[in-house]
Regions:
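Protein kinase-like catalytic domain
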Residues: 71, 138-145, 249, 277
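Active-site activation/catalytic loop segments of kinase-like enzymes and analogous catalytic loops
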Residues: 239-277
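A cross-family kinase active-site recognition segment
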Residues: 120-178, 203
Length: 278
């Protein structure tokens, strides 16, 4: 059994051992591959810690470096939108714990201020407001894309990695028929990616896993804060659209989802897109 609190303690000791931790509380949303903790100090100040063991440490470190640069370069009204990672020696501080079969890594955040949450099911006016806001946010991200650090990850490298795993770790993916189905869809994805000339799509920072539990709004439903960066990518804004289709769907936002195409076919998502493009 992995003692996650012990890893958090070690990570903080590497950051600032002069400040003592009073308690560590698991506040994970239970819908993620990451563990999230509230770390309270003896003086009652607190921070947020994220612990992950999914993927590679190098990618985790790279992502948070790009996210920090994004947060630092976004202009009004998004200059304070993104949760800020803690820095040490002017770099995002990350910690890697490696012992036996355990390989995990940690990053610390300043807590985000949370204002209004959107309801689980949005009405037409809220869908329109959200569409306009996301359009403005994507445009703001586009304007800073040329000054951000380069990312080593793309959708193509993701698929290549999956194909390698299907070759070398076949048993992890189920029976022969299931593995063949995955191989087929990997090949179809790469073929269709070429047909669409996806390499020509503009690359911007996208935060992908949008749901009403990881962002808040103010006033005329303007974006105020966003936290929880599980699936960050430097990629096409298209990646965000599927998750917004779920947020604005007739069924409303949920904690348990199936990855179905139907939310993107709803009139409610088309309404979102029409406002987005204004």
């Amino acid at each position: 059994m992995i003692n996650y609190s012990d890893i958090i303690e070690k990570a903080w000791s590497g950051y600032d051992p002069s400040r003592k931790i009073a308690k560590i509380e698991d506040i994970s949303p239970q819908v993620s591959t990451n563990h999230v903790y509230k770390v309270t100090f003896t003086d009652e100040d607190f921070i947020i810690a994220k612990l992950s063991s999914f993927g590679k440490y190098e990618h985790f470190k790279e992502d948070h470096r790009i996210i920090h640069a994004t947060a630092n370069n976004l202009l009004y009204p998004f200059e304070n939108l993104l949760a800020k990672s803690l820095l040490k020696n002017n770099r995002v501080y990350t910690y890697r714990y490696k012992k036996g079969k355990t390989d995990a890594w940690v990053v610390f955040y300043n807590p985000s201020r949370v204002m209004q949450r959107l309801p689980r099911r949005l009405d037409d006016n809220l869908i329109k407001s959200l569409g306009r806001q996301i359009g403005k946010f994507h445009l703001a991200c586009s304007r800073i894309r040329n000054v951000l650090p380069k990312s080593s990850k793309t959708l193509r490298t993701d698929i290549n990695t999956l194909q390698e795993m299907l070759q070398t770790q076949e048993k992890k993916f189920g029976n022969k028929a299931q593995v063949e189905m995955l191989r087929y869809h990997c090949e179809q994805f790469l073929k269709n990616r070429n047909k669409c000339n996806a390499g020509s799509f503009e690359t911007i920072p996208v935060f992908i896993d949008w749901n009403i539990g990881n962002f808040s709004v103010v006033n005329k439903h303007e974006l105020y804060s966003r936290w929880d960066y599980d699936w960050f990518r430097m990629s096409s804004r298209m990646l965000d659209f599927y998750f917004f289709s779920r947020v604005v769907s007739d069924a409303g936002d949920k904690t348990v989802f199936s990855y179905l195409i139907s939310p993107m076919m709803e009139d409610r998502f088309l309404l979102f897109l029409s406002e987005y493009h204004k």
